[in-house]
A protein has these predicted regions:
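Short His-centered aromatic/hydrophobic patch
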Residues: 85-91
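Donor nucleotide-sugar binding/catalytic pocket of nucleotide-sugar-dependent glycosyltransferases
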Residues: 108, 124, 129-176, 187, ...
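Conserved donor-binding/catalytic core segment of Leloir-type glycosyltransferases
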Residues: 138, 179, 187-203, 209-212
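A short, well-ordered alpha-helix in the C-terminal region of glycosyltransferases
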Residues: 221, 248, 328, 335, ...
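Nucleotide-activated donor-binding/catalytic signature segment of Leloir-type glycosyltransferases, i.e.
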Residues: 234-261, 269
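Acidic donor-binding loop of glycosyltransferase active sites
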Residues: 248, 254, 265-283, 298
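Short hydrophobic beta-strand element within catalytic cores of glycosyltransferases
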Residues: 271, 290, 294-295, 299-302, ...
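Conserved acidic donor-binding segment of nucleotide-sugar-dependent glycosyltransferases
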Residues: 313-327, 335-341
């Protein structure tokens, strides 16, 4: 049986999409040891897992000699014969040392940031080295594959495999407690647009705030719930004040993972009009939040950035918009708020799609095949 060493900078209790991606898959692997950075609350989190987590002394792991020695020692001590890099860059550079130490099979998974790296000459060479040193490089969707192919050698291009995330539809579901959230936030009688994301410019919360005055003119009882935290919060609060919509906006701040389903469920529409920035370096890899919203039964409004369109069936589960176009964002949100029947139908279609095509069990089975070398 394959025993896998997972080497990753991205792991709970640190919050984030990649962290959730890696944890959900690790929790479904048969025999696994995780090597991850230190983080506040890690001891309590690790004790609750059904697999071993070994923490690096610091909160960041880079492909240094120290990290390499620790990873090699762990591989040997635990008898691991496979390695999964939860994010290919930059820790995938450890592959040769782990191969020499006995790793028979090495898989490196890419996300949105590797698609950005593929645009930069030096970073592109790093990706090329990683691709040549591992057995498989995985990608999220067609957009990220296209970006990666331009960075990888012909040999590595032939070893690209899709590994998409899943959604726990028993966790993200309609009726998950949204009424309580709306009541607690003073939104019980409002039609709520919800956005769940880290507060950074690429995610488009600023465009939602600029769209809100026009939304309110068409739907006076609308409100915007911005869930999450991040470095852009003060700027977003200033925009809300400048647009004179602060009374119709709620900033939740950080929300515990266990409380996320209720916050999705507090909305009638999910909107995150993400946009590509920095000449393609800052781009949406996929946008699992759209799938979590769909699982909750919400119609979605997504930005056309990177792989985000892979998480929406246009016209069936939601709308795709230019994330910079305030009028387009306004129009999609208003259309959904003013036609509850259509919005409900889109939400139902989205949940059915996620239940059929986006399960964690299927993703974990795929990863297991890749780690064993049995994928076809």
């Amino acid at each position: 049986m394959t025993r896998t060493l997972v080497v990753t900078n991205d792991f709970p209790p640190r919050a984030g999409g990649i962290q959730s991606f890696v944890h959900e898959l690790v929790a479904r692997l048969d025999d696994v040891v995780v090597y991850a950075p230190a983080w506040e609350g890690a001891a309590t989190f690790d004790d609750a897992q059904n697999f071993e987590v070994v923490r690096h002394p610091s909160s960041l792991m880079l492909p240094t000699r120290s990290v390499s020695r620790r990873a090699v020692a762990l591989l040997k001590a635990r008898g691991c014969d496979a390695v999964w890099f939860g994010a290919a860059a930059p820790l995938g550079l450890l592959a040769p040392a782990l191969r020499a130490a006995g790793a028979r099979r090495i898989v490196a998974t890419t996300h949105g940031h590797e698609a950005g790296w593929a645009q930069l000459p030096v970073a592109r060479q790093t990706l090329r080295r990683i691709g040549d040193q591992v057995d498989v490089v995985t990608y999220l969707g067609q957009y990220t594959r296209g970006r990666l192919e331009r960075a990888l050698s012909a040999s590595a291009q032939g070893r690209l495999e899709r590994l998409a995330p899943g959604v726990d539809t028993s966790f993200f579901k309609p009726g998950a407690g949204g009424d309580v959230v709306r009541h607690d936030l003073g939104l019980a009688d409002r039609r709520v647009i919800v956005c769940v994301s880290r507060l950074v410019p690429r995610k488009g919360q600023d465009v939602l705030l600029r769209a809100l005055p026009a939304v309110l003119r068409s739907v006076p009882d609308a409100a915007l719930l911005i869930v999450g935290d991040g470095p852009d919060r003060k700027r977003l609060e200033a925009i809300a004040d400048r647009e004179a919509v602060r009374a119709a906006v709620r900033f939740s701040g950080p929300v515990a993972w266990a409380d996320l389903p209720a916050h999705y469920d507090a909305g009638q529409v999910f909107a995150m009009p993400c946009r590509t920035r920095r000449r393609g370096l800052d781009v949406e890899g996929l946008g699992i939040v759209y799938l979590e919203a769909s699982a909750t039964g919400l119609p979605v409004v997504a930005g056309r950035s990177g792989g985000a369109p892979d998480a929406v069936i246009l016209g069936e589960t939601g709308h795709l918009v230019d994330g910079r176009d305030v009028a387009a964002v306004t129009g999609s949100i208003v259309a959904l708020l003013r036609d509850p029947a259509a919005a409900t139908a889109m939400g139902a279609a989205g949940r059915a799609w996620v239940e059929q095509d986006w399960t964690w069990d299927a993703a974990a089975a795929r990863l297991t095949e890749l780690l064993r070398g049995t994928a076809v």
